[in-house]
Amino acid sequence: LLDSEIFNTNGYGTHGMMLLRNRFFKTCAFNTNLQDWFFDNDITQVSRLAGYTTARDIKDIKLVITESSVKYFKFMPKDMPFEQKCKRFLDALYEGKNSSVFGVVKADHDAPLMDGMMAYTNYQLLNTIGLTREGVGKLLEPSFEYLQDMLNRSPFLRYQINMTTDHATIAENEVPDLAKYRRDTVLDMSCRTPLFEQTEFYKSFRSDTVRYFKERLRKGRIAVSGNYQVLFGNAYEFLWALTDESYEPTFSFSLDDGQVCTTGFAHGEMVLCARSPHITMGNLYLAQNAHCYDLLRYFNLTPNIICVNAIESNIQQRLNGCD
């Protein structure tokens, strides 16, 4: 759990998670309102926190991790006291300095289509959801309509070009790439005059784009409403464990069995979840989306994050060993 202040001051305020790396350290840190949690539960002293910290003021708590994030512990004697392990790790991390720089490997990001509202399927998913012939037709219907719009309306073709390619202005000393030149020409000229759509240049490019789109469909790359989301397991229970040393995770405070929480879908909506990759139909998880107040209060969730419950649940096995 990483305090929202760190996200905001380092240019990641719009993100819900960052994958952090340091010396023998890696963790997936989620955007958390730690100070709000401390305030709401009247926690003003670090002595009331479970675990180990070198902080002297509760306002200095910025990052909360579990032992699994510290790979340095693997190289220490098993019988060494936990506090001594932490001190050795911090000595190696800071090397006598007052600060240590963490690397951000990646952060959550929107789905590639329709401003983050749609993503592509793959053959693995399509082969495990048990589609009938009628179901396949219904699934492909929006793609066929989009395909027809590309043939008939230039704005749709321009959107397809922008969506599938990164294009930039050719520098004076750069050798022009033919494919890039064709894309940029179509983007520019089709905006200037509708007469350009009658040229062989435009028609040839449109045919190639449509052919590429069809090939993607044959490979199982179908645009659907959804996203590739980051799993956040038992977030609210993590906060309880932080402030209650006697806490035992015997049940979920935030989510009932068969519920998930994501801002990417409406409250009460049924969502089909699957890990990528997965193996069989048994790896699919049909859940109800619940906008839990406690999760939305203490965590700055983006539509790219989904909160799940693994307490007294087989979700980790069902989703093919997800973590």
Where are these regions (language model features)?
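Conserved small-residue
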Residues: 1-321
